[in-house]
UniProtKB/Swiss-Prot annotation:
Keywords: Eye lens protein, Repeat. Belongs to the beta/gamma-crystallin family. SUPFAM superfamilies: gamma-Crystallin-like. GO terms for biological process: lens development in camera-type eye; visual perception. The gene is cryg4. Crystallins are the dominant structural components of the vertebrate eye lens. This is Gamma-crystallin-4.
Length: 172
């Protein structure tokens, strides 16, 4: 992945080939990105915090193309090749309480399938997933690896509102 300080792949450039918890020393701002291979999660703050952005192979000439809110990218993580199976349980309350539903595929509208607008906890058994704040894969994004998420803050969200989610596939 190549990070550029200016739009349209101009200005200072930094090449990264693995995850990095703090990109601050390599560039001050990020206005364009070229992904040569693989899938990546970019974070607005160091140590994999803040707004998250999911990018795959392609060119992103300005931060709006990756649904960015500004030109801050301070950490990044490479997503390993996906598993052939996906499985996730979502819960209406924290600590895996309340109504539960199990999913194996994408969901463009959580309310239509779950009857709740909020997801307070989640258990990812297989695969990697992206949560989106709004239906139809819009709004803030949250990356989930296999593991237990007892509360929405565990996946980096400031509220439990999740409008849609999908499996992370390697995009080409």
């Amino acid at each position: 992945i190549f990070f550029y300080e200016e739009r349209n792949f101009q200005g200072r450039c930094y090449e990264c080939s693995s995850e990095c918890s703090d990109l601050s020393s390599y560039f001050n701002r990020c206005n364009s990105i070229r992904v040569e291979s693989g899938n990546w999660i970019l974070y607005e703050q160091p140590s994999y915090r803040g707004h998250q952005y999911y990018l795959w192979k392609g060119e992103y000439p300005d931060f709006q193309r990756w649904m960015g809110f500004n030109d801050y990218i301070k950490s990044c993580r490479f997503i390993p090749h996906p598993h052939s199976q996906y499985k996730m349980r979502i819960y209406e309350r924290g600590d895996f309480q309340g109504q539960m539903m199990e999913f194996f595929d994408d969901c463009p509208n959580t309310y239509d399938r779950f009857r709740f607008r909020d997801i307070h906890s989640c258990n990812v058994s297989d695969g990697h997933w992206m949560f989106y704040e709004e239906p139809n894969y819009k709004g803030r994004q949250y990356y989930l690896r296999p593991g237990e998420y007892r509360r929405f803050s565990d996946w980096g969200a400031s509220s439990a509102r999740i409008g849609s989610f999908r499996r992370v596939h390697h995009m080409v």
